[in-house]
Curated annotation (Swiss-Prot):
It comes from Rhodobacter capsulatus. It is a peripheral membrane protein. It comes from the Bacteria. NDH-1 shuttles electrons from NADH, via FMN and iron-sulfur (Fe-S) centers, to quinones in the respiratory chain. The immediate electron acceptor for the enzyme in this species is believed to be ubiquinone. Couples the redox reaction to proton translocation (for every two electrons transferred, four hydrogen ions are translocated across the cytoplasmic membrane), and thus conserves the redox energy in a proton gradient. It catalyses: a quinone + NADH + 5 H(+)(in) = a quinol + NAD(+) + 4 H(+)(out). This is NADH-quinone oxidoreductase subunit C. The lineage of its organism: Bacteria, Pseudomonadati, Pseudomonadota, Alphaproteobacteria, Rhodobacterales. NCBIfam families: NuoC_fam, PRK06074.1-5. It is found in: Cell inner membrane.
Length: 199
């Protein structure tokens, strides 16, 4: 399988040299890093090229890296049922940059892009209906950003006296705790149970 993925990585890099920044196989998964401005054409290539045929969009999400210049990392996962292969596509995105929508190529991206907009605040140019999906329309902020307070800004609850839902500022008995961006898992070796027996 690794040889097939290496061949696929070479094929993608050769066919789309203007889009591909890097292509590598790590732990049996192919990850291709691309320039965000060409993502729509790149995923169209992945779908239509006879050597790829990635016809299924499995997932679309983002990762927040507050310390990086390109704060957000967009991540798309595709599946080729014809080739029995998966590919991960990544693109760095500055905080104030817009990401081109891929809804025209993969209609399934519609709600994924709405979710990423709602949770991270990333705007998608060319999206037909970019509005909040999971939070209330009056919600302030984007909950999956690492600078979003873990307590939120407002509390939503049902008031028995008023017989309706009310919004109130969050009041806590303890002080706000600052989130530590360093992860204890960074640099960890991914060893699965049973791997130690192979050596």
């Amino acid at each position: 399988m690794s040889e097939k993925l290496q061949d696929l990585a070479a094929h993608v890099a050769q066919q789309r040299p203007g889009d591909v920044i890097s292509a590598e196989v790590v732990q049996g998964e192919l990850t291709v890093t691309v320039k965000p401005e060409g993502i729509a054409d790149f995923v169209r290539f992945l779908r239509d090229d006879a050597g790829c045929r990635f016809t299924t969009l499995v997932d679309l999400t983002a990762v927040d890296w507050p310390e990086r210049v390109e704060r957000f990392e967009m991540v798309w996962h595709f599946l080729s049922m014809w080739k029995n292969q998966r590919i991960r596509v990544k693109a760095g995105l500055a905080e104030d940059a817009m990401c081109p929508s891929i809804v025209e190529v993969y209609p399934a991206a519609n709600w994924y892009e709405r979710e990423v907009f709602d949770m991270f605040g990333i705007l998608f140019s060319g999206h037909p209906d970019l509005r909040r999906l999971l939070t209330d329309y009056g919600f302030r902020g984007h909950p999956l950003r690492k600078d979003f307070p873990t307590t939120g800004y407002i509390e939503l609850r049902y008031d028995e006296v008023q017989k309706r839902v009310v919004y109130e500022p969050v009041k806590l008995a303890q002080e706000y705790r600052q989130f530590d961006f360093l992860s204890p898992w960074e640099g960890a070796q991914s060893v699965l149970p049973g791997d130690e027996k192979r050596s």
